[in-house]
Regions:
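Basic phosphate/pyrophosphate-binding loop/patch that engages nucleotide-derived ligands
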Residues: 119-127
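ATP-binding N-terminal substructure of ATP-dependent carboxylate-amine bond-forming enzymes
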Residues: 1-98, 104-105, 109-111, 115, ...
Length: 127
């Protein structure tokens, strides 16, 4: 199986003056990505890492179309916006590429903690 590993590397994250030191703590390191790719390859799969960014120089959409993965192993966090974790899955759905992890709506909802709490309480789940 041909697998595209999608993530955001901390070293590639945007930076600006005055940003918090822990702004990108949830992003990944090259060591983590190398371990995931190696584990997939040891299982007999072809695996390649792609920076989860549609903008140049990363050009994720064009690179995925060229690679034609059977599956996208998605651990992308995104960089901006309330639904940042849902952005790459939304792109993958538009490209009709299967991916691991939660669906777009679930990821977007989970980042909105007050709305998530209201939905859970509505369904009788304590928070």
């Amino acid at each position: 199986m041909r697998i595209a590993v999608l993530a955001n590397l901390k070293i590639n994250a945007p930076r600006w003056e005055g940003m918090s030191e822990d702004q990108w703590d949830d992003l990944d390191s090259p060591k983590t990505i190398d371990s995931i790719v190696a584990a997939l390859q040891s299982g007999g799969h072809e695996a390649q890492f792609f920076e989860a960014n549609i903008l140049p120089p990363h050009n994720l959409i064009e690179r995925l179309e060229a690679y034609q993965p059977d599956l996208c192993f998605n651990i992308a966090e995104g960089h901006f916006g309330n639904g940042r974790e849902a952005q790459i899955p939304a792109v993958l759905e538009m490209l009709r590429l299967p991916y691991t992890g939660s669906q777009v709506l679930t990821l977007a909802l989970a980042l909105d903690k007050p709305l998530t709490k209201r939905v859970l309480l509505y369904h009788g789940l304590p928070t």
